[in-house]
A protein has these predicted regions:
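N-terminal alpha-helical signal peptides/signal-anchor transmembrane segments
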Residues: 52-66
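N-terminal single-pass transmembrane signal-anchor helix
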Residues: 9-44, 48, 54
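Hydrophobic alpha-helical interface faces used for helix-helix packing
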Residues: 112, 120, 167-343
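N-terminal leader/signal peptides at the extreme start of proteins
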Residues: 1-15, 79-80
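Stable alpha-helical elements in mature extracytoplasmic
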Residues: 48-51, 94, 325
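Non-transmembrane alpha-helical segments in soluble domains
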Residues: 16, 56, 60, 95-103, ...
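Ligand-binding/active-site lining segments
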Residues: 68-240
Length: 343
């Protein structure tokens, strides 16, 4: 009788072999993740650059129609307030005014033009509420991890953005009759220049400020807009696109606090109402609590910020840029040749 053949058993992986395979997979994932993250950030940075270019082109279109760049913010009279909860100081800001030129004509035509008063109505005006809670494609940079958290002051919820108009080194004084003189000291050397940027605050009578042709230093040599980061918490108003005050949708007053460059970490690099203080420095959001008088360009990109120049081109400004070069890029009429590093 023929004996039955014993079935041949298939040999499986040993525990050690499985652990080796898992370890190899983990190493490969560890090697790939940074590359994937770099690709994602590169794509986000390009998206931010494209957004800035769209804002710059919209500002040019506004000038073609109105005769000048949009004001940083329209204010009630000759004086203005910068405290975010003092709504008597608010009027439409530059972003609100150029909505029709950035594919947001319905929002402007249906809501902005229907606001009966910009003063003391943030709680009750339905149209004003629709404007400040609007979120649209060009307003935010995908690199900012906090721009989805709304600001919760001044009467309710305000959507964040990541782009700001440049008031120049004189910043807070950048209004129709404000001072343009600016002096700063670097390494013991004091330099004076005209610190006005392309944008400033105007009264109700004027809905325009400087023209591109009025940028005496050359439109390609002057920052028109830059990136900013959203505030750290719901009471930090930085990055609110519908507000015109410094830190929300405008930057400036570089010389009023500490020596500033993009993404400065020191506590005086931004002076903002309800600033969270020293906890902000590690996140490129250094600030001190005070009225909104100082804010610098900021981004979540490694090593610098995107900035749209007056001619509509977008440049990446390194965090390592010198104070002098940054100040001169921020001024539209200082009359000084740019340092080589700024070109």
């Amino acid at each position: 009788m023929t004996p039955f053949a014993r079935p041949r058993t298939r040999r499986g992986f040993t525990l050690i072999e499985l652990l080796v395979v898992i370890a190899i997979i983990a190493i490969l994932i560890g090697l790939l993740l940074p590359a994937v993250q770099k690709v994602r950030e590169a794509a986000a940075r390009v998206k931010c650059q494209n957004n800035l270019k769209q804002w710059a082109l919209a500002a040019h279109s506004y000038q073609d129609t109105v005769g000048g760049l949009p004001p940083a913010m329209v204010v009630p009279g000759a004086t203005f307030s910068t405290a975010p909860d003092n709504t008597t100081g608010y009027g439409p800001n530059w972003i609100t005014l150029i909505l029709p030129y950035i594919e947001q004509a319905p929002l402007y035509n249906q809501q902005v033009t229907s606001i009966t008063s910009w003063l003391n109505t943030v709680n009750t005006d339905h149209n004003w509420r629709l404007v400040r809670t609007a979120n649209f494609n060009y307003a935010q940079c995908p690199s900012d991890p906090r721009n989805t958290t709304p600001y919760a002051g001044a009467g309710g919820s305000w959507v964040r953005g990541n782009y700001a108009a440049n008031l120049g080194p004189t910043g807070q004084e950048a209004n129709d009759g404000g001072s343009t003189s600016f002096a700063f000291t670097i390494n013991g050397v004091t330099t004076s220049l005209n610190g006005r940027g392309p944008f400033w605050f105007t009264t109700k009578a004027a809905h325009k400020c400087m023209t591109i042709q009025g940028i005496q230093d050359g439109s390609s040599n002057t920052i028109m807009m830059s990136e900013v980061l959203s505030g750290l918490n719901a009471t930090d108003s930085r990055g609110v696109w519908a507000m015109g005050h410094i830190g929300a949708s405008t930057i400036g007053s570089y010389g009023k606090g500490a020596a500033l460059t993009p993404n400065a970490k020191n506590d005086l690099s931004d002076i903002i109402t309800t600033c969270p203080g020293s906890t902000a420095a590690a996140l490129n959001l250094g600030c001190a609590n005070g009225s909104n008088t100082v804010a610098t360009a900021r981004s979540a990109h490694t090593g610098g910020v995107n900035a749209a120049m007056g001619d509509g081109t977008v440049r990446f400004l390194r965090d390592s840029i010198s104070q002098l070069a940054f100040y001169q890029l921020g001024s539209a009429q200082d009359g000084q040749p740019l340092p080589a590093e700024a070109n």
